[in-house]
């Protein structure tokens, strides 16, 4: 099996994965803290070109709130799950908070095995 980066690269070659602007904002602030605003802005621009990024609608916001109320996870993670449900998409992640057995959303574990 290849790395998570390889799996995501192959996904991007054949599809346009979904992401919420809320989560893309999270990507920006993490990168800005590590590498500065200019690099973070460039990375977001690059991701916007290959992802289907949308602002969350009210029903997705409320779905995220319901997920957060039921499960011990960050609100941004709840948005990730709600976006996957809204788009009927498999959530690709290595975040243990989102790898919930029996969750309403489908997920693929990108953590290295072993």
Model-derived features: where do they sit?
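Acidic, PIN/NYN-like endoribonuclease modules and their adjacent C-terminal/linker elements
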Residues: 81-114
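Short, hinge-like loop/turn segments at secondary-structure boundaries
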Residues: 34-38, 71, 107-112
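Short, well-structured N-terminal submotif of metal-dependent ribonuclease cores
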Residues: 1-19, 32-45
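Active-site neighborhoods of divalent-metal-dependent phosphate/nucleic-acid chemistry enzymes
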Residues: 52-94
């Amino acid at each position: 099996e290849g790395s998570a980066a390889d799996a995501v690269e192959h996904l991007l070659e054949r599809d346009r994965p979904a992401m919420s602007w809320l989560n893309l904002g999270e990507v920006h602030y993490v990168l800005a803290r590590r590498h500065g605003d200019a690099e973070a802005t460039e990375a977001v621009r690059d991701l916007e070109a290959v992802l289907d990024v949308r602002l969350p609608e009210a029903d997705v916001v409320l779905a995220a709130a319901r997920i957060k109320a039921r499960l011990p996870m960050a609100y941004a993670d709840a948005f990730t799950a709600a976006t996957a449900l809204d788009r009927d998409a498999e959530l690709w992640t290595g975040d243990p908070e989102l790898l919930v057995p029996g969750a309403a959303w489908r997920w693929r574990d990108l953590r290295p095995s072993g």
